Swiss-Prot record:
Belongs to the ScpB family. The lineage of its organism: Bacteria, Bacillati, Bacillota, Bacilli, Bacillales. Homodimer. Homodimerization may be required to stabilize the binding of ScpA to the Smc head domains. Component of a cohesin-like complex composed of ScpA, ScpB and the Smc homodimer, in which ScpA and ScpB bind to the head domain of Smc. The presence of the three proteins is required for the association of the complex with DNA. It comes from the Bacteria. GO terms for cellular component: cytoplasm. This is Segregation and condensation protein B. GO terms for biological process: cell division; chromosome separation; DNA replication. Participates in chromosomal partition during cell division. May act via the formation of a condensin-like complex containing Smc and ScpA that pull DNA away from mid-cell into both cell halves. It is found in: Cytoplasm.
Length: 190
């Protein structure tokens, strides 16, 4: 196996080891090479990352090597973190989120009555994005799950409290709440 292939494999090992990183001994064992050789390759790769226009660097802490982003790009990473996750939500998920935000705590059945369609997939998406969570159980047959918004919901849409949601007039309450909330979210995230 040539040096380029070894570096390619080590790059993959660094990636899959994630934040935990990887010891040179582990690399040596996987590649069936001496530990000193693994260290030499890692040091070469560190220099290559430093000299090139690359977004990643290889760092060593307590004998463990791992990938890390470069400090000079930190402002760009922060912009990504600050980008609302709503951009990745479907229209159905946004509509369901609007209903939960204005009517919480609310059951899945109540959401489906308002939307007129099933909400299983949308609920699953919203829970996985940590925008809603189970708030308890409703009284009544089957004790259905009650859903409500989370702190992450407030953070994502730049709200301090639910009171910061645009108010719904009586006339607007008869309209599709999801469309109103979707419009409000677009205003908030600008």
């Amino acid at each position: 196996m040539d040096r380029k292939e070894q570096k390619s494999i080590i790059e993959g090992l660094l990636f899959v080891s994630g934040d935990e990183g990887i010891y040179p001994e582990q690399i040596a064992k996987v590649l069936e090479i001496e530990m000193n050789e693994a260290i030499n390759i890692l040091e070469e790769m560190q220099q290559e990352c430093e000299g090139a226009n690359r977004g990643l660097q290889i760092v060593q802490y307590a004998k463990v090597y791992r990938f890390a982003t470069k400090k000079e790009h930190a402002s760009y990473y922060q912009k990504l973190i600050d980008t609302p996750t709503a951009a990745s939500l479907s229209q159905a998920a946004l509509e369901t989120l609007a209903i939960v935000a204005y009517r919480q705590p609310i059951t899945r059945t109540e959401m489906e009555e308002i939307r007129g369609v099933k909400t299983d997939k949308a609920l699953q998406t919203l829970v996985s994005h940590l925008l809603i969570k189970e708030m308890g159980r409703a009284e009544g047959p089957g004790r259905p799950i009650l859903y409500g918004t989370t702190k992450e919901f407030l953070d994502t849409f730049g709200l301090k409290t639910l009171d910061d949601l645009p108010p719904l007039s009586e006339e607007n309450e008869q309209m599709n709440e999801a469309d109103l909330f979707f419009g409000s979210l677009q205003e908030i995230s600008k």
